[in-house]
Amino acid sequence: MGKGNKKRFAQVKNRHRLLVLIWVLQLVAEALACYGIWELNMLPEKYFIILGAAMAVLAFLTALLLLPVRTGRLQAGMGVFLSVIIFGLSCAASWMVLDARGTIDSVVGQVSSKASAGVYVRAEDRAHDLQDAADYRFGLINGYEMQRFGEAVAAMEETLGTTMSVSYYDGSQALLNAFFGGEVDALIVNSAYVDIFEELDGYEDFRSRVRLIHEEKLNSWSSVLEGMNANKPQKGASITTDPFVIYLSGSDTRNQTLATSRSDVNILVVVNPETKQILLLNTPRDYYIPNPVSSAGTKDKLTHCGIYGIECSMEALAKLYDVEVDYYAQINFTGFETLIDAIGGITVYSEKAFVTNDKYQIVAGENTLNGAQALSFARERKHLSGGDNDRGKNQMKVIQAVIDKMTSGTTLLTNYSDIMASLEGMFATSMPMTEISALMKMQLADMAQWNIESFAVTGYNGSDYTYSAPGTKLYVMYPNDEDVAKAQAMIDTIWADGVITDETVPAN
C-alpha cells in the first residue's frame, strides 16, 4: 500500500472513530434522559414507551448515517448534525428532570413546623446578643406555652451558664405594658406573635420599637396534634380514585423562607379525581373557632392557629367542617408573587373597581396582573365593602387564574425554569411524592377537564377574647352557621361522587 493510500486510510479510520464517538455520546445522552424521566415517575407508561421507541428510532437512524466505515461527506454531515441536535435535546431533558427532582425533593413531604422563641429588647437598649442581657429581667406570657418556653429558657440558661430572672404575665397586653413600662428589660415570646402584638391598641408600631437579639428553637406542637389524631383510622385510599382534601395555606411570612406564622389564606381544596370535581372552600382568616392546641377548646382566630404550626390550622378546619384534611400545601407571600411572575402574570375578574393598599388600580371587569399586583389584589380587604369575605373570594379568583394559566398552552414548558425557581424555599407540601406522581400520570393519561367551583363562608363582625391573646379583646368574625352547613353539604356531595355547578353553588 502506497504512502498516499495509507494516509487516506488513516484519515478514514480516524474520521470513522470520531463519528462512532459522536454516536456513542448521543446514545449515552438519550439513555440518561430516558432513565431520568423514568425515575421521576410522572409520565404514563404508554407515553414512556412511545418516548423510548422514538429515541431508539433516532439512534438507529443516526447509526445508519454515522457508523458505516465509508461514509460520504454529505451523509456524515447530516448524521453529525442530527446527532448533535439529539444530544443537545437529551441533555436539556436530563437537566430539566434533575431540576424538577431537586425542587420536588425540597418541597415534598415536609411535615414539621419551625418556630422560635425570640428575645426582644427595646430599640434603644445596649444589648446586642443574649450574653449582653444575661442579668436582665425577662417577661413571658403565663399559661398555654409554658412547657415549650420552659424548655427554651432552660436552653438559654445553659448557654449563659446562669439562672435567668423571669416574670410571668397574664396576657399579651399585660406583658407589653410591663415591658414598655420598665418592669422587665426583655421579652421572650414566640416570634410569630409579633403580628398579634400589632393588633393590640397602642402597639401597632411594635416592630419599630424593639430589636431581636436572640432566637431559641421551640419544639413543635405536632406531638400535641398527633395525640389528638392517634385514634383516627388511616385513610388507605387511592389518590386517583377516592376523594381527598388539601389545606392550602398562604403563610404570612414576608421573607424568602417558610416558617411558622399566621396564615392569611385558608382554603380547603376538596378533590374527587373520579368525577374530576374540585371545590375551593375559603374560610376568613378571623373566623372565631376552637384552637386545637387548647385542651379546653378555647376559641381563637383561625389565622392565629398557624402560629402553632400548619397542622393546627388543618385540625381547626377539619373540626369546623367535620371532614378529614389529608394534606397541606403552603406558600409564602414572596413565593406567591414570584410564581405569578414566572408564568407571565394572570387575568382576574373583579366585580368592583377599587385601589389596593399598595396603590394598584383595579378596574371593574378583567384585570391583567403581575405578581406584585396579584398579591396586592389577594391581600386587600380595607377598601372592599365585604372586608374579609370579599378578600377570600378574590383569593380564590387568583388561585383559579393561576391554575388556568399553568394548564393552558405551553406555559409550563416555556416558563419551566422560572416556575421551578419560584417554588424552591417558598412552597411546601405534605403530599408524598408517590401520590403526586400518580396524579400527574392520571392527568397526562386522560387529559381530562376539571370542573372547579368555589364557595366562601361568611360571618359576623365582633370583638372577643382569643386563646392567643388572652385578656384582650380582638376583632373576630363569628361564623355564619348556615354557610358552614352549606359548605359541609357541598363536601358531602363531592364525597358521594356528585357534581356541583355554578347553578348549584349556594349564594351568600
PLM regions: where:
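Internal/C-terminal transmembrane anchor helices
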Residues: 74-97
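N-terminal Sec-pathway targeting helices
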Residues: 13-22, 66-82
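Short hydrophobic alpha-helical membrane-anchoring segments
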Residues: 32-39, 65-67, 89-99, 198
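Non-catalytic, solvent-exposed segments at the cell envelope interface
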Residues: 108, 112, 120-123, 129-131, ...
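Short N-terminal helix-initiation segments at or just after the protein's N-terminus
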Residues: 58-69, 79-84, 194, 266-272, ...
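Membrane-embedded alpha-helical segments of integral membrane proteins
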Residues: 17-65
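Alpha-helical transmembrane signal-anchor/signal-peptide segments
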Residues: 98-115
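Short, Lys/Arg-rich, polar N-terminal cytosolic tail immediately upstream
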Residues: 1-9
